[in-house]
């Protein structure tokens, strides 16, 4: 499970703003965000068990994230949702990523998942349950966890929205500052929704803040390797700016050819 908030196309200089807390078993290892070789280049963390990822950005400015969710009819030996997320990041647009998700999920070989997909052209959520549903991402703030996007029955989602909208989020700086506080909120008492989860064997294991601007130099990628109420956000923005600049150069070269 995870908690992800995306502010989409409501801040002109930063059309994609993301905050996400990842929940996983504590003994499931992962690697810090790094640039993955291949085309297109990807910046993401890697799950060492399956080799997939939970979220990332590619050099075309495509964001893809995945949140696990319940599914009634689970396959006996499910394919990795994280590997699918990584494969979606190898596509060149949000629409291509949606097509790949639909093609793979329709095989019935995956456990339940929500895929959040966005670039500057379009944004989507794929609800991968027993019935697959594609929902266009609305402009503004959307929140998703283990249910449908912007599910009014999700108490954790409602808490997240309340914390993020205590002030107007009309710039990347304001969104990231507010999100870093909200997503670092310590665990709530038992029985109440919280931003950071902590139990004996699993809980919040990392947190990510992302801003994708119109220009590569404006991109931000911050990552906390641990629950963000205890671990500090470290800056990986130079890596993100590097791959976005590479993507822009390659696009200009193709246009001249």
How would you label these PLM feature ranges?
Residues 1-257:
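N-terminal nucleophile
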């Amino acid at each position: 499970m995870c908690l992800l908030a995306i502010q989409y196309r409501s801040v002109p200089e930063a059309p994609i703003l993301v905050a996400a807390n990842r929940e996983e078993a504590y003994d499931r290892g992962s690697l810090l965000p790094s640039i993955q070789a291949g085309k297109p280049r990807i910046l993401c963390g890697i799950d060492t068990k399956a080799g997939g990822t939970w979220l990332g950005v590619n050099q075309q400015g495509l964001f893809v994230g995945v949140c696990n969710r319940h599914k009634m009819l689970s396959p006996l030996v499910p394919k990795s949702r994280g590997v699918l997320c990584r494969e979606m990041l190898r596509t060149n647009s949000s629409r291509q990523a949606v097509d790949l998700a639909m093609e793979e999920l329709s095989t019935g070989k995956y456990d339940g998942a929500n895929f959040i997909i966005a670039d500057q052209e379009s944004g989507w959520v794929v609800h991968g349950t027993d019935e697959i549903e594609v929902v266009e991402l609305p402009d503004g703030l959307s929140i998703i966890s283990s249910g449908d996007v912007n599910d009014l029955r999700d108490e954790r989602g409602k808490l997240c929205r309340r914390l993020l909208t205590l002030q107007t989020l009309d710039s990347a700086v304001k969104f990231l500052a507010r999100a870093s506080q909200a997503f670092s909120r310590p665990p709530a008492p038992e029985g109440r929704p919280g931003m950071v989860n902590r139990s004996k064997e699993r809980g919040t294991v990392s947190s990510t803040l992302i801003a994708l601007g119109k220009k590569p130099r404006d991109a931000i990628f911050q990552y906390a390797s641990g629950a963000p109420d205890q671990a500090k956000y470290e800056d990986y923005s130079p890596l993100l700016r590097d791959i976005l600049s590479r993507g822009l150069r390659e696009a200009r070269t193709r246009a001249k050819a």
